[in-house]
Amino acid sequence: MPLFRNAQFEISIAKPSGLPPPNGAEIAFAGRSNAGKSSAINTLAGHVRLAYVSKTPGRTQLINFFRLNCGALLVDLPGYGYAAVPEKIRRQWQGLIETYLRTRESLIGLVLMMDSRHPMTDLDRQMIDWFAPSGKPIHVLLTKSDKLSRGPANATLLAVRAELTARYGDQVSVQLFSSLKKTGVEEVEKVVAGWLVPAAAEGEAPAGA
């Protein structure tokens, strides 16, 4: 069965003190508010409304946890960079996301969504800089790749990969992804599955996972 298929919503938290005790390896999904994060999660899960909970009023500020069949957790972080959000709320989001990324021991990797037409914004770089010191892997999905023709899409992939490799080496990997065309699904599943193998060996995954 595909890794993310049949994911089930488990819990939402609004502040670091609300984080549940570690109970399985966690894979964080992050991205700008318009980067197609919810669509990517829904496509990977094969569920058109799995990430809908994070779109409902009052939920957009939350970290949402979804349990996978393998026992690991998909962790949907609040979208960042939405201009209409009051500054106070943006600071709260920033504190919540930064604390989670920097301190969560059960977090084994970050999947970061960037719009392939506008990748590597200042906020994208900040997100990577928050997480990179952990030494844990980062996988970048260049979303909405169907909006670009093959030549520009591949050029963007090569440019982003070159920039990130120059700075972070093999800690960061990059791929094209399209929720509309469902392209890139197997690649991201393979990458994340590779993260889960050492995590299970170290006891991060629940017994029987």
Curated annotation (Swiss-Prot):
UniProt-listed Gene3D superfamilies: P-loop containing nucleotide triphosphate hydrolases (3.40.50.300)
One GO cellular component term noted in the UniProt record for this chain: cytosol
Domain of life the protein comes from: Bacteria
Gene Ontology BP term (one): division septum assembly
Signal peptide bounds: none
Residues in EngB-type G domain copies: 23-198
InterPro entries: G_ENGB_dom (IPR030393), GTP-bd (IPR006073), GTP-bd_ribosome_bio_YsxC (IPR019987), P-loop_NTPase (IPR027417)
Binding-site residues, Mg(2+): S38, T60
PROSITE patterns referenced in this protein's UniProt entry, alphabetically: G_ENGB
Annotated residues for binding of GTP: 31-38, 58-62, 76-79, 143-146, 177-179
Keyword line: Cell cycle, Cell division, GTP-binding, Magnesium, Metal-binding, Nucleotide-binding, Septation
Record HAMAP family: GTPase_EngB
Function: Necessary for normal cell division and for the maintenance of normal septation.
Family under the similarity heading: Belongs to the TRAFAC class TrmE-Era-EngA-EngB-Septin-like GTPase superfamily. EngB GTPase family.
Full protein name: Probable GTP-binding protein EngB
Organism of origin: Azoarcus sp. (strain BH72)
Record lineage: Bacteria, Pseudomonadati, Pseudomonadota, Betaproteobacteria, Rhodocyclales
